[in-house]
A protein has these predicted regions:
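Short, acidic, small-residue-rich periplasmic hinge/interaction motif at the N-terminus
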Residues: 26-64, 72, 139
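Extracytoplasmic beta-strand/coil segments of soluble accessory domains associated
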Residues: 72, 76-113
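A beta-strand signature from Gram-negative outer-membrane beta-barrel systems
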Residues: 129-175
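Flexible loop and strand-edge segments within Gram-negative outer membrane beta-barrel domains
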Residues: 211-217, 227-239, 245-303, 309-336, ...
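Membrane-embedded beta-barrel scaffold of Gram-negative outer-membrane proteins
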Residues: 302-318, 437-440, 466-523, 528-530
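Structural signature of Gram-negative outer-membrane beta-barrels, strongest in the C-terminal barrel
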Residues: 346-497
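Gram-negative outer-membrane beta-barrel transporters
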Residues: 349, 391, 489-498, 516-600, ...
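C-terminal beta-signal and adjacent terminal beta-strands/loops
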Residues: 495, 543, 594-601, 609-611, ...
């Protein structure tokens, strides 16, 4: 199965790479000067080839070209990423970078991190793409040294940037979108933008999603094959977002945001033979407000400050005779107060220094008897220095972390203190070629979450932080190969990660206990290629592909049966290929997303194996203007081959489905 998968994926990648190899001998180095302008424009859209650490970017135009309408769909196109998807339209979706786990991946929303001190991971399904201008994924320490200290405190970061209002002939913009699809999907979206005087503007965004999620799937039990229907997979969610933008010239700029999310969804659970009963439900309610202020003095000194308040409530309920009283209900309330300030000093054109400091207070209240009710103070300070010239970029940073917890009941953990360094370099050895060599190192850790420390009977206040060391070396190259290929971009990175004191759940007599028992070694390669090929007049073809190889093995104990086995839910081979044909009539995009065999449990035996899959999708769209309105019609067919597969074992993904959307911009 694995060999067949590799052959198929290699054939698909090779089929469109062959013309590039044949044309490489026709490289005209004199065209380089045209591309230097592309790198300058990278200040708006970060240049992925100039970075000293791996960076992948997808802007609004790229998402529309690929027909992407969901954040997790976009992230799956990035190399080195595993999206844990529990199936269904409303299923939990988290992001893991290079097998380090979702708790090592930060998620930022307009420059301010989104956090969950209880679980340590962020569900990206709660964010909409309809008001997003760009997403980016950085691995290691990004070259942008003027960011919050929290962004230094993770192994990788998924950054979501929403669209700011852009006014042309009138002082307002309006946007309406209706999306429907299989399994009862209905998703209306409304956005309104208003200019207020010369210095202010505002936007309002509303997004409601409803779906039954009752999709069919094939259940195989030995020789018995049955057709089943997923139950209790419905979702209802509402997103509201308001933004205010102020531009004061020499007085700087101020952005404010208010965000509200409310959802109710069923948890279909794993598929159990001869038992389709599922009554688990979860309610989520999240509100946050954040402010960002930025100013520049004397063209050499920049200042920024952020403030955020976050409220999060969740209710879990399961109805079953196994509980006393016939049901189990868990209530959790989190509050966060967060502040950040930073300065960037540029004494000369090539050298910059930054100092960023954050402070946060997190609390958790739940309905458990004698609950610890923890309160956590976190202080982060990051100092960075960067040298950046057309030939060389070198960045070094040092992060200082101090964390202390207080509890109302039970024992509290020891305070956590640590210094975390990072170094990266990018070098362009040939003046006439846009070819760069890069290398980076980062030492980082994650503190145990509230669940790790305090969860009923499983928590362990003696846990140490989980440490991760990252090494990366690679190269990037982009240029025009010939008149037939407008732009070819390539990045190849090899990496080695080491995780120690990994926090895992270990069976202990009659219960499971969180322990520092794991050690993991991760070796891998990430490859990204893109090409823009003009065909004829208004016809063009955009090709994108990514490939990842990850050898992530458990090296904890040579005596254990899973020693040097691949860690759970990490495919050795994964990748994606997209081909977009743009023309004056209908734009067509074909996408393939693939992952090799994985294992659901630490032992790599057949009973734990999850088969590889290849998902094919097709998207068509057409935009046209009518009077003062711009219309866009899009249709998508997902999982063209109607193949049943799991990303998480026993959580089947939907088969063939369709989506249709109509948007109007005025």
């Amino acid at each position: 199965m694995q060999n067949l998968f590799i052959k198929r994926l290699s054939g698909l990648l090779g089929a469109w790479l062959f013309p590039f190899v044949a044309l490489y001998a026709q490289v005209d180095t004199t065209t380089y000067h045209q591309l230097s302008g592309v790198e300058v424009l990278g200040k708006v859209r970060p240049s992925t080839t100039r970075e000293s650490t791996p960076l992948q970017v997808m802007d609004k135009a790229g998402m529309e070209r690929l027909g992407v309408q969901d954040l997790s769909e976009a992230v799956k196109r990035f190399s080195g990423v595993t999206v844990q998807d529990y199936g269904g339209i409303g299923g939990l979706k988290t992001v893991s970078v290079r097998s380090l786990g979702a708790k090592h991946t930060a998620v930022s929303y307009d420059g301010v991190t989104v956090t969950d001190a209880q679980s340590g991971q962020v569900d990206i399904s709660r964010f909409s793409l309809d008001n997003v201008d760009m997403i980016s994924l950085s691995i290691g320490q990004a070259d942008d040294i003027f960011q919050t200290a929290r962004m230094y405190a993770s192994a990788g970061a998924l950054s979501i940037k929403t669209a700011a209002p852009l006014f042309k002939e009138k002082s307002y913009n309006a946007y309406v979108k209706l999306k429907g699809g299989s399994f009862g999907l209905f998703n209306p979206v409304v956005r309104y933008e208003q200019r207020i005087g010369n210095r202010w503007s505002a936007s309002l965004h509303a997004d409601w999603l409803s779906a039954k999620g009752d999709y069919p799937f094939t259940l195989i039990n030995g020789k018995e094959v049955t057709e089943e229907t997923r139950k209790n997979s419905d979702v209802q969610s509402l997103r509201l977002e308001g933004n205010v933008y102020g531009h004061f010239g020499q007085g700087g700029k101020l952005n404010g945001k208010v965000y509200y999310y409310d959802s109710e969804r069923g948890l279909p659970g794993s598929v159990i033979l001869y038992n389709s009963n599922a009554r688990e439900r979860v309610w989520d309610n999240n509100f946050f407000t954040q402010l960002h202020y930025e100013n520049e003095w004397f063209d050499r000194l920049k200042f920024q400050a952020n403030a955020k308040y976050n409220y999060s409530f969740s209710k879990y309920r399961d109805i079953s005779n196994k509980y006393s009283g016939g049901k189990q209900e868990d209530l959790n309330t989190q509050n966060e107060y967060y502040g950040s300030a930073g300065i960037l000093y540029t004494p000369c054109s090539y050298v910059s220094f930054s100092l960023n400091t954050d402070i946060a207070r997190n609390t958790l209240v739940n309905n458990f008897v004698n609950a610890p009710t923890p309160k956590r103070w976190t202080s982060l300070t990051a100092f960075a220095i960067q040298y950046k010239s057309p030939v060389l970029t070198a960045t070094a940073s040092l992060l200082s972390t101090y964390i202390t917890d207080k509890v109302e009941n039970g024992d509290r953990p020891a305070d956590k203190k640590r210094l975390s360094p990072a170094v990266s370099i990018s070098w362009r050895p040939f003046q006439e070629q846009s070819f760069r060599i890069r290398a980076s190192y980062k030492d980082i850790f994650r503190v145990p979450t509230f669940t790790d420390l305090y969860y009923l009977r499983m928590g362990n206040v003696n846990l140490k932080p989980e440490k991760a060391t990252q090494y990366n070396i690679g190269f990037t190259w982009n240029d025009e190969i010939s008149p037939f290929i407008r732009l070819l971009s390539v990045s190849v990175d090899g990496y080695y990660n080491k995780v120690s004191d990994k926090i895992v759940a270990i069976p202990n007599m009659y219960i499971w206990k969180m322990m520092n028992m794991g050690e993991v070694e991760i070796k891998g390669i990430d490859v990204n290629l893109s090409a823009n090929i003009p065909l004829y007049k208004a016809f063009s073809l955009l090709l994108l592909s990514s490939y990842s190889y990850q050898d992530a093995i458990d090296v904890t104990d040579p005596e254990e049966k899973n020693y040097k086995n691949q860690i759970p839910y990490t495919p050795r081979h994964s990748g994606s290929v997209s081909a977009s044909l743009e023309n004056p009539w209908v734009n067509v995009t074909y996408t393939l997303v693939a992952a090799g065999d994985r294992y659901a449990l630490p032992q790599n035996i057949e009973a734990n194996q999850i088969d590889s899959y290849i998902e094919h999708s097709l998207s068509v769209n057409r935009s046209f203007a009518l009077k003062k309105c711009t219309f866009k019609v899009q249709g998508d067919i997902l999982n063209l081959t109607d193949k049943t597969y799991d990303i998480i074992q026993y959580y089947p993904m939907p088969g063939r489905s369709w989506r249709f959307s109509l948007s109007i911009t005025y």
